[in-house]
Amino acid sequence: MRATTRAVIVVAFVCCLSAVAIVVFRQSRSKPLAEGAGIEFPAAVSQATKVQLLKDDFRIITNVSVLPTPVLKAFQEKGGSRSLLANPGAKFNPSDVIWDASVPRKRLIFAGASTDRCFVHYEQGGRGRSYVIEVFGLRSGETMEPLWRGHCTRPADNLETLRSQITGGGCF
């Protein structure tokens, strides 16, 4: 009887330790995302400039990790390496109710890079889902310059649709 009692106590102890380890592991994996670096975009950009910004031949990007390095860093948490931008189709927080603070509130629709510019078109969760375009000038391998940040009335499926939206005033 005594051996059985000891076995039960040992099993219970191991189960408790396992439960604690699982909780600690899950909490470490679901650490809330920190804020990103504050990016200052120009206050006003003319319609002609907005149209001109997307005139280049852009290589389309559908994976966040393929963004040019300085732009990728702009979409990472400050002081960390986790992305604040989810890949297309990946889990993200689409509303103002945050169920998992470790999941980004922004999700890439698509991006594009040319020799001297990069744009990122993404959806952002909140009180209402919004569709954003951010355009950056690429100065070297490690620096970028924010050129324009706009809100679009709807998401674009491809670069031509995005260009049409901008030309027609659908991104302001």
Which role does the model predict for each range below?
Residues 128-134:
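Structural motif
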Residues 117-123:
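Short beta-strand elements that form the blades of beta-propeller/WD-repeat-like
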Residues 124-127, 152-154:
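Solvent-exposed loop/turn segments at secondary-structure junctions
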Residues 5-10, 21-117, 149-172:
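Flexible low-complexity loop/turn motifs enriched in small/helix-breaking residues
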Residues 1-3:
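N-terminal secretory signal peptides that target proteins for export/translocation
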Residues 138-143:
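Short loop/turn segments immediately following beta-strands, especially the blade-tip
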Residues 12-17:
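Bacterial N-terminal signal peptides
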Residues 132, 145-148:
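Residue-level detector of beta-propeller blades
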